[in-house]
């Protein structure tokens, strides 16, 4: 209470000084309840002001700071917080009421865990029954060769053919492969033989990276064939030479990606059904060539359930085909007879010529209508 007493005294003194100032009088200073004499020097009370308040022109700046002002402010804040806490108490009570008990939570968790476990088991069983798709080569890759890659001479475009070991079965394999592919792919006999040859490589060469590199080279050769076709038309070739080099490179890359995506799609399909397409000749003949009234794709689908015989090997190199038998099997009588189909195929004249290979990369392309052309893509810069 001493602080309040001092505050009251100070207010009275200030009020008295204001009144005396209005009447032109000055109050006498008191010190310890002692009144100064009439002839004594009058002294005023020392002014106490808050820090930084001397610049204020009103009388509030003369008030003395007390510690109770901070206490009052803290009390007001505590009251506000208490009021907010009282408002939140009903909400907290409702939340506690709705909170699930431990027993109820345990009862609900058991059925959920059983359902998830049953769902996972069913999903795993269905996945095991489905045919596992191979990884294959991604179709999301976009090729963009620079000018340096295009400004190089490619090898001579040569006529391609089916290798001798594939000739006896290439027609049935090609027909089954066409049925498996989409209509927009429409693979040719030579393309089927080329894919067959890629999967008939040595084990060391059988890798996705090597196949991917080979598919890029095949797509690049197809672009070369497109350029050869443009050269055969004088008007189209003149227009091509009028285009700037960057635009030519962009057009070549577009064609390259079109051919590459087509090759990748055919490659992935052939890899997925590899065991059925290039299985042993006898089982392949019975499932594809021996069926009547049904499509090759249906026969191939049934053939997927038939286990394959072991492939023959020679000189350390694996081959998915055994030597073709010269005797045909009669399913009705259960006897074998000499096959005339094989000799007819050998005597028949094939429109495909013998292939020439470079290393492990055989060239299987159809002979151009305009003949063999030796062209360099470096001419695009001329």
Curated annotation (Swiss-Prot):
Q: Indicate the secretion signal residues.
A: 1-21
Give yes or no: UniProt keyword Signal: yes
Compositionally biased intervals (Polar residues): 310-323
- What domain of life? Eukaryota
Location of this chain's protein in the cell: Secreted; Host nucleus
Segments of this protein annotated with the region Disordered: 308-382
* Record keywords: Host nucleus, Secreted, Signal, Virulence
Annotated coiled-coil positions are none
Entry GO CC: extracellular region; host cell nucleus
Positions of short motif RxLR-dEER: 48-65
| Transmembrane region(s) | none
State its role: Secreted effector that completely suppresses the host cell death induced by cell death-inducing proteins.
Q: What is known of its domains?
A: The RxLR-dEER motif acts to carry the protein into the host cell cytoplasm through binding to cell surface phosphatidylinositol-3-phosphate.
Regarding protein family, the annotation reads: Belongs to the RxLR effector family.
Query: What name does this protein carry?
Result: Secreted RxLR effector protein 118
> Which source organism does the UniProt entry give?
Plasmopara viticola (Downy mildew of grapevine)
What gene does the UniProt entry assign to this protein?
A: RXLR118
């Amino acid at each position: 209470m001493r602080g309040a007493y001092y505050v009251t005294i100070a207010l009275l003194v200030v009020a008295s000084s204001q009144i005396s100032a209005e009447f032109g009088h000055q109050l006498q200073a008191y010190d310890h309840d002692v009144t100064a004499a009439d002839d004594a020097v009058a002294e005023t009370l020392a002014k106490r002001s808050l820090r930084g308040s001397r610049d204020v022109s009103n009388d509030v700046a003369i008030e003395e700071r007390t510690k109770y002002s901070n206490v009052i402010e803290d009390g007001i804040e505590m009251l506000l917080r208490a009021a907010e806490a009282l408002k939140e108490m009903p909400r907290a009570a409702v939340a506690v009421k709705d909170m699930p008990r431990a027993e109820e939570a345990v009862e609900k968790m058991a059925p959920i865990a059983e359902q998830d476990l049953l769902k996972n088991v069913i999903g795993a069983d269905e996945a095991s029954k489905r045919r596992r798709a191979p990884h294959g080569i991604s179709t999301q890759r976009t090729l963009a060769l620079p000018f340096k890659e295009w400004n190089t001479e490619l090898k001579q475009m040569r006529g391609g053919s089916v290798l001798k070991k594939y000739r006896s079965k290439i027609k049935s394999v090609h027909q089954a492969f066409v049925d498996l592919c989409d209509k927009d792919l429409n693979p040719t006999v030579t393309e089927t033989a080329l894919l067959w040859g890629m999967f008939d490589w040595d084990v060391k060469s059988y890798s996705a990276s090597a196949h991917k590199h080979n598919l890029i080279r095949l797509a690049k050769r197809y672009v070369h064939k497109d350029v050869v076709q443009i050269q055969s038309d004088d008007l189209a070739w003149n227009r091509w030479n009028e285009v700037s080099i960057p635009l030519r490179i962009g057009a070549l890359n577009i064609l390259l990606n079109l051919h590459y995506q087509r090759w990748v799609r055919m490659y992935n399909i052939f890899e997925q059904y590899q065991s059925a397409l290039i299985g042993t000749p006898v089982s392949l003949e019975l499932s594809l060539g021996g069926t009547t009234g049904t499509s090759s794709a249906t026969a191939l689908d049934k053939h997927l359930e038939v286990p394959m015989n072991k492939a023959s090997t020679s000189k350390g190199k694996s081959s998915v085909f055994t030597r073709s038998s010269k005797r045909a099997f009669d399913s009705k009588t259960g006897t074998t007879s000499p096959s005339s189909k094989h000799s007819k195929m050998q005597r028949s004249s094939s429109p495909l010529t013998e292939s020439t290979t470079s290393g492990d990369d055989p060239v299987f392309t159809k002979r151009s209508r305009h003949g063999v052309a030796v062209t360099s893509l470096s001419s695009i810069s001329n």
